[in-house]
Amino acid sequence: MKILIQLFFVFTISILYSFQGLNIDKNNQDWIQIFNGNDLEGWKVKINGFPAGEDKFNTFKVKDNSLVVSYENYDHFKNYFGHIFYKNPYSNYRLRLDYRFVGNQCKGGEGWATKNSGVMIHSQSPESMEINQEFPVSIEVQLLGGIQKPWKRTTANLCTPGTHVNINNRLVTTHCMSSSSETFYGEEWVNLEIEVNNDSIIKHYINGKEVFSYTNPIIGGQYNTLKDKKGDRLKEGYISLQSESHPIEFKNIELLILQ
């Protein structure tokens, strides 16, 4: 009888672990690759000074399974701020990717744009942007790289082109705010994850650690080209990756839809 009880216990534990394994596999399957690593299918470029879909200098390209922001065809940056948008808008999701800054900044780039890029969320569409519009109305998860030790330069910060947010239940109109992340000085890959919950709470993670959170994104403030929507809550929008004059690479770009 004692042996039977032991066998039953082992069998039950085995079944539980099997189900846990199935659940883990299911969760992994829920992540959608929105960049296939081969081409830019499903993505559209918008460069300041040009209509949506036109990338005169081939800024965004694919190399070694990474989405690469390159300035090899630029003589001078000339404020050609750009973004590449994924085709669908989203509201509730987790976005994760790896990124790294590489090489030297393009000639003519702003000093503040050295090792500077971003992931835009809750963004307006590329088609709705004006020809001469540097940044989409959006929430920017700002990516920065360290330039020289010991000067700290956090990443996964918050910038708000045409938007405002609440922090600790207070409306914040400051354009850029620093996260609590560490500084990455080299060309190492850094893992970024963003949790977006409609017009409620948004969280930034670096290498698995939460480094910033805020709530209640709305339209308004500096860089707002949607004047008729001032004060509207941002409940959904497009995802885009930024080109601000410093080469950067992105890979493993995946999305998990939340209920």
Positions of PLM-derived features:
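Carbohydrate-interacting regions of secretory-pathway proteins
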Residues: G21-Q259
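Bacterial Sec-dependent N-terminal signal peptides
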Residues: M1-K26
